[in-house]
Amino acid sequence: MTKQIQKTVSVCIIGRPNSGKSTLLNRIIGEKLSIVTPKVQTTRSIITGIITLKDTQVILYDTPGIFEPKGTLEKAMVRCAWSSLHSADLVMLIIDSLKPFDDVTHNILDKLCSLNIVPVFLLNKIEIESKYLNNLKAFLTENHPDSLLFPISALSGKNIDRLLEYITSKAKIAPWLYAEDDITDLPMRFIAAEITREQLFLNLQQELPYKLTVQTEKWEELKDKSVKINQVIVVARESYKTIILGKNGSKIKEIGAKSRMQMEQFFSCPIHLFLFVKVRELWENNQEFYQYMKI
């Protein structure tokens, strides 16, 4: 019996916050793995997505958005994004086609050039008519002639098949790093924490979602095939805790119910979710939390 030839290719997806990196990863692997919200800087760490197509395994790295960081957490997120480039065969810079170029995007291009990296450009959100699209195409084509350019819609899936054909064409003969049906290498505890953090982003106003983190402290598989999960939402101030709890605990109950539903859908089993809020001043300066967040 002839042994199957295996190929692998790794792809790093970088770009500004809210340019569509997480939506693209989810679209390609066919699962909602990376959390998505309308707020910027939702992704804090590298999210690895895996899809195996015939003889080729594609490993995708969704990264935190690149911007001008100020605080300790923001700086760690941007460092995390840049660190992912060195482990990838392809670097894809995703650009929001609904916005003009700005200094941050130019700085990203300059840094890629200084690193001798020739990125693939992905002009995203073409499902919406944009007055900037043609100018973006012209600028990139003229100033970066060695780079390929794909207009895509991560949301609708337009041109994603073409993009995948290109990605798989760059695969090299090498043993797969993961099982054929794996979609990520992230621990289930981490994924569960990300699901709850997504609901905190969606259900809390203003800056509060940026001032917290979530840790899964307990994951217990029960005899009836359900899972008991205890999570701690860590905040820096007592006033933040009050907001998250809500009147008579109404807000945290709402967040818990929505998180549990998302977990049951992702993990395909009944979930018993228990949320707790703890105040830890200056948690953003504690390396322990960064290790848990993988940044």
UniProtKB/Swiss-Prot annotation:
Domain of life: Bacteria
Region feature (G2): 41-45
Keyword annotations of the record: Cell inner membrane, Cell membrane, Cytoplasm, GTP-binding, Membrane, Nucleotide-binding, Ribosome biogenesis, RNA-binding, rRNA-binding
Ranges where the record places region G5: 152-154
Name listed for the protein in its UniProt record: GTPase Era
Molecular function (Gene Ontology), one example: GTP binding
Family of the protein in this entry: Belongs to the TRAFAC class TrmE-Era-EngA-EngB-Septin-like GTPase superfamily. Era GTPase family.
Residues that bind GTP: 15-22, 62-66, 124-127
CDD domains hit by this protein: Era (cd04163), KH-II_Era (cd22534)
Subcellular location: Cytoplasm; Cell inner membrane
Record domain Era-type G: where: 7-176
G3: region residues: 62-65
GO process terms (BP): ribosomal small subunit assembly
All residue ranges annotated as the KH type-2 domain in the record: 204-281
Membrane topology: Peripheral membrane protein
Gene name of this polypeptide: era
Positions of region (G4): 124-127
Residue intervals passing through the bilayer: none
Functional summary from the UniProt entry: An essential GTPase that binds both GDP and GTP, with rapid nucleotide exchange. Plays a role in 16S rRNA processing and 30S ribosomal subunit biogenesis and possibly also in cell cycle regulation and energy metabolism.
InterPro entries recorded: G_ERA_dom (IPR030388), GTP-bd (IPR006073), GTPase_Era-like (IPR005662), KH_dom-like_a/b (IPR015946), KH_dom_type_2 (IPR004044), KH_sf_prok-type (IPR009019), P-loop_NTPase (IPR027417), Small_GTP-bd (IPR005225)
Entry GO CC: cytosol; plasma membrane
Quaternary structure and partners: Monomer.
Region named G1: 15-22
